[in-house]
Amino acid sequence: MASLLLFVLVIQIITYLINTIGARTIDSLLWLLYIKLPNQASQVAREQRHAKLEVIRLKREMSATSSQDEFAKWAKLRRRHDKAMEEYDVKNKKLSALKTSFDWTIKTVRWVSTTGVTVILQFWFSKSPIFDLPRGWLPWQVEWILSFPRAPLGTVSIQVWGGACGTVIALVGGAMGVAAPAFKKINQPRGEAQKMGTPRGSREQTPVRKTQ
């Protein structure tokens, strides 16, 4: 069961990283990578950016054109601007629909690969011990808790092992988050700390007594 032990540990680490970084942040990064690939979404994204730039350009030309002195030119620019705006709205709605579908797919894959796999493993291996405890090492009450709910007495169940892994990973991650700023401060170069001292040229001068 060593492979199952490590597999549960890896799932808990992945789950912790997702919760720490944030699902939305990960989804946004994956979307940016996805639209860089040669697919329909990347094509629509390029067309949407092109339409947006065209709207901005026409709007600037309209602002630089007087609606009174150059009404004919201004009206022509206005019609082109409205048409470009409509095209931009169509591309933007299409891109939003593709992103919604992409986000739903990513959420489904993320749930299946973490929570879904955990539930399936806990159900399928509920009677299988992750590892055996030394005989007589712990009281039978503690052994019963560690084997909960259906693993043999004197062993550790997959449910208990998964919960223990999640707790330890969260504690280690929290400790690293607290220790990182302190470690960075300790390793700060001394030159930067010395800059906070008395600036050059600001020494106090000893008063000189005048002789009569």
UniProtKB/Swiss-Prot annotation:
<keyword id="KW-1133">Transmembrane helix</keyword>
<feature type="topological domain" description="Cytoplasmic">
    <location>
        <begin position="25"/>
        <end position="110"/>
    </location>
</feature>
<comment type="similarity">
    <text>Belongs to the WRB/GET1 family.</text>
</comment>
<keyword id="KW-0812">Transmembrane</keyword>
<dbReference type="Pfam" id="PF04420">
    <property type="entry name" value="CHD5"/>
</dbReference>
<feature type="transmembrane region" description="Helical">
    <location>
        <begin position="5"/>
        <end position="24"/>
    </location>
</feature>
<dbReference type="InterPro" id="IPR029012">
    <property type="entry name" value="Helix_hairpin_bin_sf"/>
</dbReference>
<feature type="topological domain" description="Cytoplasmic">
    <location>
        <begin position="173"/>
        <end position="212"/>
    </location>
</feature>
<keyword id="KW-0813">Transport</keyword>
<feature type="topological domain" description="Lumenal">
    <location>
        <begin position="132"/>
        <end position="155"/>
    </location>
</feature>
<feature type="compositionally biased region" description="Basic and acidic residues">
    <location>
        <begin position="201"/>
        <end position="212"/>
    </location>
</feature>
<protein>
    <recommendedName>
        <fullName>Protein GET1</fullName>
    </recommendedName>
</protein>
<dbReference type="GO" id="GO:0005789">
    <property type="term" value="C:endoplasmic reticulum membrane"/>
</dbReference>
<dbReference type="GO" id="GO:0071816">
    <property type="term" value="P:tail-anchored membrane protein insertion into ER membrane"/>
</dbReference>
<keyword id="KW-0472">Membrane</keyword>
<dbReference type="GO" id="GO:0043495">
    <property type="term" value="F:protein-membrane adaptor activity"/>
</dbReference>
<keyword id="KW-0256">Endoplasmic reticulum</keyword>
<feature type="coiled-coil region">
    <location>
        <begin position="75"/>
        <end position="99"/>
    </location>
</feature>
<feature type="region of interest" description="Disordered">
    <location>
        <begin position="189"/>
        <end position="212"/>
    </location>
</feature>
<feature type="topological domain" description="Lumenal">
    <location>
        <begin position="1"/>
        <end position="4"/>
    </location>
</feature>
<dbReference type="GO" id="GO:0043529">
    <property type="term" value="C:GET complex"/>
</dbReference>
<dbReference type="InterPro" id="IPR028945">
    <property type="entry name" value="Get1"/>
</dbReference>
<dbReference type="InterPro" id="IPR027538">
    <property type="entry name" value="Get1_fungi"/>
</dbReference>
<feature type="transmembrane region" description="Helical">
    <location>
        <begin position="156"/>
        <end position="172"/>
    </location>
</feature>
<comment type="function">
    <text>Required for the post-translational delivery of tail-anchored (TA) proteins to the endoplasmic reticulum. Acts as a membrane receptor for soluble GET3, which recognizes and selectively binds the transmembrane domain of TA proteins in the cytosol.</text>
</comment>
<comment type="subunit">
    <text>Interacts with GET3.</text>
</comment>
<keyword id="KW-0175">Coiled coil</keyword>
<feature type="transmembrane region" description="Helical">
    <location>
        <begin position="111"/>
        <end position="131"/>
    </location>
</feature>
